[in-house]
């Protein structure tokens, strides 16, 4: 009995002697992206309290809802962000797992401060530039918002052809910055050095641009492009009859929308532009990315069947309230019948269902799923260059390039060029698999071969 008491006493003293107060630093690695996280722990009268910092996101002092430490086990919970960290203190390190939104990632914490990793991006230009660069603002009078961007000219004085760069889906700045890359900065630099002026701008509601991104659809973004054209026509440095559009991903859907209605557009370039209807594209994208991530055929088939039914509801719906009811019932039924389905940590089933319904029924998603690019492409009469990467899993080249070419040809457009670049992904990087998880790990931002081909084609159209 005495030895048992001594053992319990040893455990108690050992636990008491472990000091977890102070700063704990870690790096969260998600799909090649590295995000520094810091937990600041202080002792209270009864237990512990802490805050969380995310230096790379500019966030500091985020309240940690619950901090527990018992027998070397530590747990942090941030309820609002649905974050949970569980770890075990081993000497001067906490070995543990970071959870958020149903996903888990290994992340260890230490006392040592972690400096931001300098990622190599050799293609990004550095100032001073060899050309003229000007920050500009222009108005979208239809939406009553101002948009801010950058206009680059080969020289300050002169008269040049110009392209407007149109970003892909999701809120993005003028450089189309994502996963540590700035594709539009690289494209702009290359084209401007090749005698072509470039206008790139922050999406509405992003950076210095005004407006509400969340409520906008592709049709709304098309009016932003139209206002960019109107602005460029006021600039003496721009050749009014040589204004082109270069759209990436969703931008490759928007460019034809504008070109089909505007005589001011003299050519368009579609970088991984969509050629098939949105609901079909999302299902194809989901299947290819799941395969690349090693998901089983059985799980892929099950997921595709579920989403096909949900997407069909969206495409057929013309009543938003009824749609939300249908979606809610359908997702609840799926969760009831599928015991393997997981609700994200810190989230109730109702909260999870509501999140899914709001995402699928958002204005942007409904518009995208219902929109068939072919109907617009058939009306485009200006020269078109459509290019894709062979390993693009988000906008697969075979289905989309074929659909784009067929629609343009059907409409009588005789100046159509399509090309599939070997070993390039959705961002036009030279890659191994094409999986989105690779994007940030690749030093290259945009294939020099693709840049050269695009620039040469534009030069031919603007001679």
Residue locations for each model-derived region?
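Central antiparallel beta-sheet cores of small beta-barrel/beta-sandwich binding domains
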Residues: 18-90, 95-103, 130-131, 184
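Short amphipathic alpha-helix adjacent to the substrate-entry channel of hydrolases
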Residues: 177-198
């Amino acid at each position: 009995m005495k030895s048992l008491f001594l053992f319990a006493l040893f455990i108690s003293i050992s636990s008491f002697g472990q000091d977890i107060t102070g700063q704990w630093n870690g790096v969260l690695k998600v799909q090649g992206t590295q995000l520094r996280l810091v937990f600041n722990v202080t002792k209270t009268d009864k237990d512990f309290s802490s805050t969380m910092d995310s230096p790379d996101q500019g966030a500091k002092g985020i309240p940690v809802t619950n901090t527990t430490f018992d027998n070397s086990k530590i747990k942090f919970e941030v309820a609002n962000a649905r974050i949970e960290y569980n770890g075990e203190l081993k000497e001067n390190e906490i070995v543990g797992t970071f959870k958020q939104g149903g996903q888990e990632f290994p992340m260890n914490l230490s006392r040592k401060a972690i400096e931001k990793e300098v990622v190599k991006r050799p293609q990004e230009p550095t100032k001073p530039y060899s050309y003229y660069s000007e920050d500009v603002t222009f108005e979208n009078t239809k939406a009553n918002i101002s948009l801010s961007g950058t206009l680059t000219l080969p020289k300050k004085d002169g008269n040049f052809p110009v392209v407007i760069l149109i970003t892909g889906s999701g809120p993005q700045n003028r450089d189309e910055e994502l996963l540590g890359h700035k594709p539009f900065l690289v494209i702009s630099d290359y084209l401007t050095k090749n005698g072509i002026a470039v206008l790139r701008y922050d999406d509405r509601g992003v950076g210095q641009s005004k407006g509400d991104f969340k409520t906008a659809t592709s049709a709304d973004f098309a009016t932003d492009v139209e206002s960019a054209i109107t602005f460029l026509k006021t600039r003496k440095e721009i050749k009014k009859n040589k204004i082109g559009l270069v759209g990436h991903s969703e931008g490759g859907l928007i460019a034809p929308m504008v070109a089909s209605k505007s005589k001011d557009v003299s050519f368009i370039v579609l970088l991984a532009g969509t050629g098939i209807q949105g609901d079909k594209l999302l299902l194809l994208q989901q299947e290819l990315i799941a395969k690349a991530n090693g998901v089983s055929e059985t799980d892929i088939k099950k997921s595709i069947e579920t989403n096909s039914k949900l997407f069909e509801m969206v495409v057929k719906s013309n009543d938003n309230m009824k749609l939300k009811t249908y979606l809610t019932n359908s997702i609840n039924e799926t969760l009831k019948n599928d015991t393997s389905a997981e609700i994200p940590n810190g989230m109730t089933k109702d909260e999870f269902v509501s999140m899914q319904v709001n995402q699928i029924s958002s204005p942007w998603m409904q518009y995208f799923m219902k929109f068939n690019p072919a109907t617009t492409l058939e009306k485009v009469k200006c020269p078109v260059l459509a290019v894709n990467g062979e390993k693009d899993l988000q906008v697969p080249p075979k289905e989309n390039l074929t659909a784009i070419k067929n629609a343009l040809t059907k409409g009588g457009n005789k100046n159509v060029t399509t090309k599939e670049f070997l070993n390039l992904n959705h961002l036009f990087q030279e890659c191994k698999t094409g999986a989105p998880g690779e994007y940030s790990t690749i030093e290259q931002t945009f294939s020099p071969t693709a840049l050269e081909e695009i620039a040469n084609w534009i030069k031919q159209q603007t001679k």
